[in-house]
Amino acid sequence: AIINMGQKDLLIDCQGNWGDVRTGDGAAAPRYIEARLNKFALNIAFNKQTTLWQKSYDGRKNEPTTLPLKFPLLLAHGVEGIAVGLSTKIMPHNFIDLIKGSIKILEGKNATIFPDFQTGGQVDVSDYQDGRRGGRIKIRATIMEKSKNTIAIKDVPYGVTTGSLIDSIL
């Protein structure tokens, strides 16, 4: 989980080889990487006005009971999970779009946001359904033919690595 969060470059200051979502390269072993929350994460998660604290199990330290964030982190990072009788997949959204959408909602206006992907690609959101059950999105690559023997791939679809794309072409 921490590798996934660190690769998104939003909450974690990363040190070491964290891998690359574009190429599919894995991260180094945990003993070779370091992580700490960045200033943004500390501000949105550990805010004195929104975070409730309780004593730890041995009473020596305080720990948060919950982390009510001041930012829609699930939408920014995206998440996928299953449980008994249900499943979900929330695609990642653009940071700036989320800030602008949050401001609109706080102003009492409607906001429309769509998924945005770190690796690029085109997305068809005609059946997105604003998060309601059954919505779908289609993700496509941008491929241009430069010559008879050469193609240029401008964007790679979300979830596809350059390594797996090369393997599928060869």
Name each model-derived stretch.
Residues 136-170:
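Gly/Lys-enriched N-terminal cap/neck module of very large, oligomeric protein machines
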Residues 1-134:
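Catalytic phosphate-handling regions of large nucleic-acid enzymes and associated NTPases
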